[in-house]
C-alpha cells in the first residue's frame, strides 16, 4: 500500500498507463492477425494493404517502448517475407 502522496499518485498513474498500454498492445496484435488472415486466405493485395497499415503502428509502439524494437522488426520482416512469398 502506498504510504506517501507521491506513491499514491504514482500508483494511480501506473494503473492508467497499464490499461492504455494493454489496449495498444491488443491493437498491435489485431493488426498482425489481420495480416496473417489475409496471407492464409491467399489474397496478396489485401495482405499487402494490411501490412502497409500495420507498419506505422508497430514502429510507433516500438519507439514508445511498448514492445521491444527487435520484436517489431521481427514481426515486420517475417510478415513481409510471407507476403513476398505469395505467388
From Swiss-Prot:
Q: What is the superkingdom listed in this entry's lineage?
A: Bacteria
Q: Which GO terms describe its molecular function?
A: small ribosomal subunit rRNA binding; structural constituent of ribosome
Query: In which residue ranges is the amino acid composition biased (Basic residues)?
Result: 7-20
Single biological process term from Gene Ontology = translation
Q: Which UniProt keywords apply?
A: Ribonucleoprotein, Ribosomal protein, RNA-binding, rRNA-binding
Q: Which Pfam families match?
A: Ribosomal_S20p
InterPro entries (UniProt xref):
Ribosomal_bS20, Ribosomal_bS20_sf
The record's region (Disordered) falls at 1-22
Identify the GO cellular component terms for this protein.
cytosol; small ribosomal subunit
Alphabetized NCBIfam families for the sequence = S20 (TIGR00029)
What family is this? Belongs to the bacterial ribosomal protein bS20 family.
The role this protein plays is:
Binds directly to 16S ribosomal RNA.
Tell me the protein's name: Small ribosomal subunit protein bS20
Origin organism is Nitrosococcus oceani (strain ATCC 19707 / BCRC 17464 / JCM 30415 / NCIMB 11848 / C-107)
Amino acid at each position: 500500500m502506498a504510504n506517501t502522496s507521491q506513491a499514491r499518485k504514482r500508483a494511480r498513474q501506473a494503473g492508467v498507463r497499464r490499461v492504455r498500454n494493454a489496449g495498444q498492445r491488443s491493437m498491435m496484435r489485431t493488426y498482425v492477425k489481420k495480416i496473417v488472415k489475409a496471407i492464409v486466405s491467399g489474397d496478396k493485395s489485401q495482405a499487402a494493404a494490411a501490412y502497409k497499415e500495420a507498419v506505422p503502428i508497430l514502429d510507433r509502439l516500438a519507439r514508445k517502448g511498448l514492445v521491444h524494437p527487435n520484436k517489431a522488426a521481427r514481426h515486420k520482416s517475417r510478415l513481409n517475407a510471407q507476403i513476398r512469398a505469395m505467388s
